[in-house]
UniProtKB/Swiss-Prot annotation:
It is found in: Mitochondrion inner membrane. Its cofactor is Cu cation. This is Cytochrome c oxidase subunit 2. Belongs to the cytochrome c oxidase subunit 2 family. Residues 46-74 are mitochondrial matrix. Its EC number is 7.1.1.9. Component of the cytochrome c oxidase, the last enzyme in the mitochondrial electron transport chain which drives oxidative phosphorylation. The respiratory chain contains 3 multisubunit complexes succinate dehydrogenase (complex II, CII), ubiquinol-cytochrome c oxidoreductase (cytochrome b-c1 complex, complex III, CIII) and cytochrome c oxidase (complex IV, CIV), that cooperate to transfer electrons derived from NADH and succinate to molecular oxygen, creating an electrochemical gradient over the inner membrane that drives transmembrane transport and the ATP synthase. Pfam families: COX2_TM. Component of the cytochrome c oxidase (complex IV, CIV), a multisubunit enzyme composed of 14 subunits. The complex is composed of a catalytic core of 3 subunits MT-CO1, MT-CO2 and MT-CO3, encoded in the mitochondrial DNA, and 11 supernumerary subunits COX4I, COX5A, COX5B, COX6A, COX6B, COX6C, COX7A, COX7B, COX7C, COX8 and NDUFA4, which are encoded in the nuclear genome. It is a multi-pass membrane protein. Residues 1-14 are mitochondrial intermembrane. It comes from Amia calva (Bowfin). Disulfide bonds: none annotated.
Length: 74
């Protein structure tokens, strides 16, 4: 039964719906892990003081391009 202010799916009424709920949970976990890994890499890249003379200073825009899809997915 669905409840007001419920964030997830309602209770499954069939075996197919139960499998769909498991798939949804699994897919969200994968998205969360990928987003966390990308965020960690961005934080490490931005906070480290090591630079390469061939790297252009466009890290801010690259960071935005990488973070925006994660924000949209959330």
């Amino acid at each position: 039964m669905a409840h007001p202010m419920q964030l997830g799916f309602q209770d499954a009424a069939s075996p197919v719906m139960e499998e769909l709920l498991h798939f949804h949970d699994h897919a969200l976990m994968i998205v969360f892990l990928i987003s966390t890994a990308v965020l960690y890499i961005i934080v490490v890249t931005v906070t480290t003081k090591l630079t390469d003379k061939y790297v252009l200073d466009a890290q801010e825009i690259e960071m935005v391009w990488t973070i925006m899809p994660a924000v949209v997915l959330i």
